[in-house]
């Protein structure tokens, strides 16, 4: 479909409540909003129309963000902030009528410059006047860097006067307008309140969906914004103040100079770790030079400790921010004015200049990067999963001392950065998608989970057991490869279990691990370590027995943990029971997820073993044949079948409808896991903050750390699946989407639980391994209990309107489940009698 015909189709499809505006073509699209170009019938001006469907704002927090954005934009007017002209609402949609910025966002100037100078007359003229400093990177000319820094500073100064913190400063939210539209000389330009050079494109801050009124002394705790540009205190779930915006300004300034962000990583926590490890040293590529006073400013902004970070007054009065740029306005540039008017009259958005045959892409020889949406609220959505397993680039570099200037930046390694003919200079990957997505909203529950786990780690017992490790609050623990038993050969039981320090307990891990291997058809990738001695030793074979006994008692209505008063004596059994349920649900989700994104045979997996928060394994169980051989290396065998499929071929091997179904099922199961994990932390939190002594057992501490890690992992994988579903939905016919059947997580759990119990009964009748049968019955009971337990509903767990009150189980459904629970519990009792 041509751009023109597409625009006409859009105009017919969108109808605003009033007739003050006409809607033309779509210029940006994201998960929550579609941005159209339009025209105001009052004065004929071009406008941007941000259409947000109410149906996509299912989360209360997202609706609040939109309402906040509208409220803020109505109150603030500034030449370097995208203005809200009008707002219209219908029963199904919000329409924000905003200033139109025909040149897109700052990423077009940085990442698409090479393509645009060949196609866009105004941008070509700008870069002819102010050429880039080097062909080796995408950094901008110093004049452009300082000009846009000053305009950004002007907008931030205005926001500070209103006690506003933006919380999502990044190049994608810095829009560029064509210059010389309402003025033609420097005097008029500055009288209108603009800062910088009058004949250059004008920068304006957009997207106030995450902004908040926050005085200088106030602290916030919600994690939001885009991780690549987030301050470390936000990445680490700490409270933060308005100085978080200054960190983001530092990252933008660095990117304008070097053509890429200062830090990159595969997830939030790895990014935080890289920032912390840098120890306030900022490394730049060896092919990039930043003058000392700009580099000093970057270092002041990119200071890890917010207390030591440059303050707003110091920033606003910095010599670079206050530098006089009037000398660049002395000469008249007729080309800029004529080209600017041509662009305005052409009615073309910047991305339309980039549409061209694929054959020309190779001939261009420029940097190939992801297209970005360029208007406020248009989320970047790429289909980059197939690049997921490319080797990750080390962006830290090797620091080298500079002899020219003591304040000049250390030069970093150029590995993976310098270009050669026919090669791209940087590789995009799914990791970048996760980090660059437009909206990151982590509910307050996430902050609470991590905060509580840190409290336990800080205040809990260090160790009372020989060989146990101290539990630390940081979420970056890695497995040790040392063997605490010295030269003693591990026993058969120890060789069967390779259990990380975050497992609930050895006995419980054994039960749950076998359940995941034998019953869910999925074996978790094990760590590359062969030792199990550096974790706390909690060998208590009674735990699993107690858990199964409790399941039987609950089935006989002789026990209901939630009706008991929480105390020091029963808090651990409470949490153990919930951990068991969370693990079977998590394992079910992992089985589905492994079919969508198989684990690669290397450490470059997104869910890397180097990051415990994202590690898949709480335990790893060897195959019986391998175990009996006594070969410890057999632990490193990954799941056969699906996990051997390369990520590059997974989309082709699974038909799109089936892939989408798998994604939806896996997402629902991860969300259910999150609900159970949050429930256990809510319970623990209540006990912890009512406990004056703030003392807990080592076992409970380990459980809490395990729950925290699983919670964060499930959240990350749910985000990945949400984005993948969005990509799949975009590629499908709307008619097909309407015809898709609804998937109920309750039915998934119910069917799986009955399937497990049937297989266990068959195995028992065949005289199979009774231990396996016991595990299967227990797993089935835990899954069915999840369906019946009202305390594990999302409405009960999340107190902030996170979920709806919709449930797919009526009383007759519950009665049927109770009958199965009773039947399976009786089988389990009979089996235990046989075993004893």
Swiss-Prot record:
The active site is at residue 168. Residues 411-425, 459-468, 630-640 have a biased composition (Polar residues). One of its GO terms (cellular component) is autophagosome. ATP binds at residues 27-35, 50. Residues 571-836 are annotated as: Interaction with ATG13. The keyword Nucleotide-binding applies. The keyword Transferase applies. Homodimer. Dimerization requires the presence of ATG13. Forms a ternary complex with ATG13 and ATG17. This is Serine/threonine-protein kinase ATG1.
